[in-house]
Amino acid sequence: ATVAAVALEVFTLLKRSGTKLKRDLILAWTGDEESGGAGIQMILEKNPEAVACEVALNEGGGLVLGKDGKVKLANLQTGEKIYHDFELTAQGPTGHSSVPLKENAIYRLASALDKLGRYREPARLHPVVRAYFAGRASQEAEPLSGALKALAAAPGDLPKDPLAVVEAEPSLSALLRTTCVATMLSGGTRANALPAEAKATINCRILPDETPDQAQARLTAILDDPSVKISSLEIGGESPASPLEGPGPRAIEKVVAGMFPGAPVIPVLSRGASDSRFLRKAGIAAYGFSPLPISEEDSRRAHGIDERIPSSSLRVGVEVLHRLILELDTH
């Protein structure tokens, strides 16, 4: 909502000032971004020319404030993991709980989940993650700084010791692989009855150069149990990363350098999902870049109690986005 408010303010400013742009400027406010992206999907399906563009700006990255209150870096989201849910279903004979049977749907499901919980994908560097590690290294202290540099520079297999340092941070470890985790369970209808089936929802965040079909095939191999059915609940589809170079990144780098000297622009791969994935799939170079400076402490409040944006950040955000639009208009 805050990014939308800043965008509206900038559009109003451009209109009132009589600014003449050489290129079309489109404002698309879409619903359902948090729970599926139905809004942008409908536009792309029913009226794609309404959002036809070369560069799209969305939330997802942004300006990070240091402890001194100054912008220390700018995260530029150029790609994101594919959100995809799978469902595991195990079946078993029903009956009265006073006569336990060896074949039990809940036990079958529990065995499958235990296999999944003990498995971890081998680490590998997606190009966006490599660029992110290289940029973030300068912002960290040792030993993490050196470990990030070593991984970013590794031409082949990732060196073991630096990898261990980076993987000790769960948020960084998740960028090195496709992840799948159990998030919901259901099974049984009465305490005194053996369940006919038990189900688990598995949420996967898939690296953008993989597909949900590949993730499902890997789940099948991990579980290695034909009695446990794996079905797809949501078609996330492929979501290729946006180019690391081009009009969008160049304009953002120029504006950041002019307003916040010394703050690097670092490409990031988002672990979460946004509407940008649908734009990228449609061939639009979409970039996550919130113009509002925010501290790491406040960013952790997102979707939680006391979620907030400083009023000063709103004022800065208007200037950042205004400059960015004018800069993009020159490309």
Where are these regions (language model features)?
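Acidic/histidine-rich catalytic neighborhood of metal-dependent amide-processing enzymes
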Residues: 1-75
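Metal-dependent amide/peptide-bond hydrolase catalytic core
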Residues: 62-72, 76-79, 83-317, 322, ...
